[in-house]
Amino acid sequence: MDSTFSGIEIGKRSLFAHKDAMNTVGHNLSNATKPGYSRQRVTMKTEIPLYAPQLNRAKKQGQLGQGIVVQSIDRVKDELLNTRIIEESHRLGYWTSQDKFISILEDVYNEPEDQSIRKRLNDFWESWHDLANQPQGLAERKIILERGKSFCEGIRNRFHSLERIYIMANDEIKITTDEANNYIRNIANLNKQISKSQAMKDNPNDLMDARDLMVEKLGNIISVSIENKQDPNEFLIHAEGRHLVQGSIANEFKLEATNGPTRTRWNILWANNDKAYLKTGKLGSLLNIRDEEIKNEINELNNIAANIIEIVNEIHEAGRGMDKKNGRSFFSQELKLTDDRGRYDTNGNGQFDSVHIFKINSTNEIFPEEKLGFYGTLKFEATNSNEIVEIPYNAPDTVQDVINRINNSNAQVTARINSEGKLEIKAVKEQEDENITFKIKHIEDSGSFLTKYTGILNASGPEGAYDYKNIDTTDKLAPKSTYSISPLKNPAAWIKVADIIDSDPSKIASGIKNPTNEISIGDNQAALRISSFGNSQIMIGKNLTLNDYFANTASNIAIKGQISEITKESQSQILKDLTDLRMSISGVNKDEELANMIEFQQAFIAASKFITVSVELIDTVINKMGV
């Protein structure tokens, strides 16, 4: 029922309600520049009036109002828009990181023209051409030595530059994973606090803002989805179908240190120790950069180093220096297999288990336009696969037709006719675990092309096949065929001119031994063959020439850089538009808040005056009516 003091109670309620509203305005203005803050507003409701419709109600006119109270303090938030921003954040995180590291990779290739690897290599071939014109010249040999050392230095410098970028990406993976775990822990902790606050029927707006901001930052690192049920303990964050957060439970990522191609490699694991193959967000980008982009660049550099070492040494070992001796390599053969049949202990158990042969040269001289006159099927293992590639040949086919089919297939070998007119089968680079390998895996011929015609294999069919898993597989090769053993690991890191050549340039070969094992004065065949490699079809992987290789390498990284830059800018604009839209809804408008402050201030003053009048009425009743 109403009373003499009901006026004071109504005024008090208004006073407190508008004071809370003014405090909320002040809170909004104080946090106007804080990232992630959502504008708050006070929702007021009219207090339940007198009298309730019941039998014992007072016999007077009603209902009589009881003033106003604060119902809730709410965030102004568009949850659907917020979810959209979180969904878009991982794309910006991915392409920002991608653009950063691709730009760093581009800087490695943006060498001064006169210091580029391509220029150094061209100068190296040119110096061999000069020696071919003056095969007895010591000065020409000294120039070859210096240019060879310069080329090796360029290869090693690029390798170490790529290695440093690999280490940067690897370190950033660890840092970013720790950052993600920090967000996951904090979100779970905030869920616990929010749950307690909501249990008291409060709206923990600032805690929820802090949680939303952390979820958004986590969404930049990895693509996440949110499931916010009515039960606050069931605020879920999913990533790649896994629970990262469930209420106050945090399932953090784990880091596992393994051996990488150059240094320690960090693997990301889920909470249950399964390996996390992340494809989105900043972490997905870093994994792609480290395990694909940088590793591919290192592998390509190893590819060119291994091939140039091989083709130059093959001719140089057959040639003779000024002392008329042969059998000397121009480039160092460090880190090669010690077994002369290419047998290798892969498992480290003390027993050979595979054969690593890089290149095989046939016994017989062949001619590209010669028709075969017979038919059969070649079988090779596919690149980075255990599948078999079959390449048929028929009687009307020429030798070059068969070579083209091999090179245009997915076989993990290439073929060409070398400078001696013999068929050369060479392995292309493959990725095994964390390292690049150069080894021929399988060669088989149902007919006579690789047996009687070229002289690579002893016999046709499966029983005559070369297979690297058979440690005696070199017995399957024709007796007079020759082969080269594979480099073990990162030839680009250790490539250098052999010490014996470095100490005495006169040992650089210019001529080729003849059938009488003598060398003729003025013989320039070794120098001439090596100088021709600059424009010859020597097959660096699937590239025909060195020029093709350099052109493809440079264009590939340039295209990737352009794509990453454009996509990052596009994604950044999309996220900016969404963020601007969110700010127009949830952001603090200072003019609007100041207008609200004046409104609430006037209401507060009115309430205080009403209380003053109510007190005067009570004073009249008590002191002036003689009661």
Curated annotation (Swiss-Prot):
The keyword Secreted is assigned to this record: yes
Pfam families cross-referenced by the UniProt entry: Flagellin_IN, Flg_bbr_C, FlgK_D1
Subcellular localization: Secreted; Bacterial flagellum
Main subcellular location of this protein, as a coarse class: secreted
Keywords per UniProt: Bacterial flagellum, Secreted
BP term (GO), one: bacterial-type flagellum assembly
Residues in coiled coil: none
One function term, GO molecular function aspect: structural molecule activity
Entry GO terms, CC: bacterial-type flagellum hook; cytosol; extracellular region
Protein name, entry field: Flagellar hook-associated protein 1
Family affiliation: Belongs to the flagella basal body rod proteins family.
Top-level taxon of the source organism: Bacteria
